């Protein structure tokens, strides 16, 4: 549960997470991003991209939007997903699931098994990375995407 603290934290009613994050958005974002990488550092990020992320996250409206995404996942999205499951709705297009082998998702329920409950034709592979596959291991991420798209 400690690894996924961000879900219940960010889903709290406003303005709690917005206020706490807004007190030092650069510290919060750097901490979260570093802790979600396999190396627990920001080394995988191009400095220009990191500057862009930090600039965007200093905007209170973007912080709020991030929190709203988690609130939706905890409440409205959950209800929609539940209704889809009860109706027997499934994703029928071929689907590729990628996840970081050292990421939080890998420590919870197996990601491929989770997606197989929702899709009829899903394949997947763990990328040797944390949460940020494209930044941490671009070669393996691109190879997995190209393989899937060429089939």
Name these PLM-found stretches.
Residues 1-126, 146, 151:
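Flexible "cap/lid" subdomain of the alpha/beta-hydrolase fold that forms the substrate-access gate
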Residues 130-142:
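Catalytic histidine-centered segment of alpha/beta-hydrolase-like enzymes
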